[in-house]
Every structure is written in C-alpha cells, then in structure tokens.
Amino acid sequence: MDKVKHSKIIILGSGPAGYTAAIYAARANLDPFLITGTNKGGQLMNTNEIENWPGDYNKISGSELMNRMYKHAIELKTKVICDTVISVNFKKNPFFLIGENNKYTADSVIIATGANPRYLGLQSESLFKGKGVSTCAVCDGFFYKNKEVAVVGGGNTAIEETLYLSNFVKKVHLIHRGINFRAEKILLDRLEKKIKSQKIIIYLNSIVKNILGNSSGVTALLIEQKNSKEKTESKIQVSGLFVAIGYTPNTNIFVNKLKMKDGYIQVTRQEHGNYTQTSIPGIFAAGDVIDHVYRQAITSSASGCMAALDSERYINSLV
C-alpha cells in the first residue's frame, strides 16, 4: 500500500448519492475523495431506461446518467479513486479507513455505499436481468403497460409493487412462498379490492422454479405450488417479473461502529441541519444505506446533497 492519503471529505460509494455529495463538496472547495467501491455507478448501471429523471423526458439509460454525474464530479476536481474500503476506525478524528489498495484519513466521511436487491438465485434470473426481470416497479413498470407481469414476495414492498403495477398493466400475478402476507393491513385491504376487480391473481405456497424467454426477453414463468399432499407445477405467461423480496444494505464494515437497524444506518434527522448525521459526529450517510422506503435515484441524490452540506458545516465547526 502507498502512504496514507488524506482529504477533508471522503465519500464512499459511486451511485447517485455519492456523486451528488461529491459535486456539492467540490463546489464548497473541500477537495473530496470519492472511493467508488466494487459496484461502480450503483444499481442504476443495470437500468436500461429511466423515464422519471426530471428534465430527461426522452429517456436516459442508467449508465448514461451515472456517466454524466461522474463527469460533473471530475469537472469540479473531485478525486475519484477506484478502491474498496474494507475496514474503518471512527473512534477519533481524523477518521481512518483501510482500502484494498490504500489507506486514508478524513476529517469527515459520507457513507453512500448503497444496497443491493435480493434475488431468487435462479440461473435464468441472471440471464433476463434488465430484459424482463426487475426489482423496481416504479423504475420499469411503465414498459409493461397493458401486458401481464408477475411479482414475487410477501411483504410491504411486494404488495406496494403489485398495487402500483395494477394501475396500468393488464394483470399482475402475485407469487408468495407462504400462506400469509407480511404486509400492513391497509395494503392488504387495498390488495383485496384489486383482487375482486380481477386485476390481480394470487399464488400462495408457491415459488418460481424457472424463468422462460427468448432473445426479446421474458415470456413465461414456471411455478411450483405446494398443496397439503403434493407439489404441482404450472406455467404462466408474463412479459416481466418483479422480484420484491427485500434489499441488503452494503453496511457490513460499519457493524459495531455505527448505530444501525436491520442493516440500515441510523441518522439523527435533526430539524436544523445534521439530517444525515450518524451516531458519530462527522460521519454522515446518504442514499439506500439509510432509506428502505423510497429507494429512487432522485431521493438518493437529494440525501447526498444534504450529507455534503451537513459535512461542510461540520468541517467548518472544526476550524
């Protein structure tokens, strides 16, 4: 490893939250480092078309949007470092970080390492990712207008995705491995109304065995349903599959270092600034590591902006 590299602000993560934080920190003349991590560009790199980014009504790919953010950050003199931080020491300032390639110190750290959606683990799932298999109905649902789709999951996210899709797709097939949904009652009440309208078909005690398709994308699912005495297999014709079985925040290295809940970093959300401060002053968090509800590119960018402003205020207080 080279000698220790120091920056006033080090940003961990290269998704919308990380790059937005870098842009704001650079404009404040804080000369930020942005350490990309292994998942460069974040989840958006797997999104073929984005139709809800303000100002880009002609659609934009996730990779194109992230490339724009990268160029913007570079133009403002952000130092983008291709490394992955594997260990941190937040006990005293300057904070100490160890990467696979270098060691770093910083007066303030912004954690924007994101979260990864959980998948079913099928080989065919990887084959059709971005070609019919998605983890975000708000991002990709509109492409299936007047088509039949399936949703897998049994919690709040799965029910919310199902209800959202049912507003414009032809039919939603909701597949759940259990016999009872884990969602809130208000969501289940809405689901019941949609079922009566025959917009949603429920498959309980069921799992997806295989995803079928061709070069154009997904065409059908092979599902297995467990009855009291036997298992039966059936095929349903769909154009898309939305996997909604949860997310895993990329926060393992912060366990026992920061206050967390279910893997998500807890922030103070104070009324007058420090909305993104973690349990340690000077350490801030943004994007999907703090958000298990909205998970949109624009909300991640917004929290990245707030984290940079909070971090700037903290650094100024050290002078």
Swiss-Prot record:
Disulfide partners:
C136-C139
Highest taxon, organism lineage:
Bacteria
Q: Say which enzyme class the record assigns.
A: oxidoreductase
Cofactor dependency: FAD
The residues listed in the UniProt record as binding FAD, with positions renumbered to this chain, are 36-43, 288-297
Q: Which GO terms describe its biological process?
A: removal of superoxide radicals
Q: What terms describe the molecular function in GO for this protein?
A: thioredoxin-disulfide reductase (NADPH) activity
Cofactor remark from the record: Binds 1 FAD per subunit.
- Fetch the InterPro entries from UniProt: FAD/NAD-bd_sf, FAD/NAD-binding_dom, Ferredoxin-NADP_redctase_2, Pyr_nucl-diS_OxRdtase_2_AS, Thioredox_Rdtase
Q: Which UniProt keywords apply?
A: Cytoplasm, Disulfide bond, FAD, Flavoprotein, NADP, Oxidoreductase, Redox-active center
Question: EC number(s) per UniProt?
Answer: 1.8.1.9
Q: Which reaction does it catalyse?
A: [thioredoxin]-dithiol + NADP(+) = [thioredoxin]-disulfide + NADPH + H(+)
GO CC annotation: cytoplasm
Give the subcellular location. Cytoplasm
**In which family does this protein belong, per the annotation?**
Belongs to the class-II pyridine nucleotide-disulfide oxidoreductase family.
Q: How does it assemble?
A: Homodimer.
Give the misc comment: The active site is a redox-active disulfide bond.
The protein's name is Thioredoxin reductase
Gene name of this polypeptide: trxB
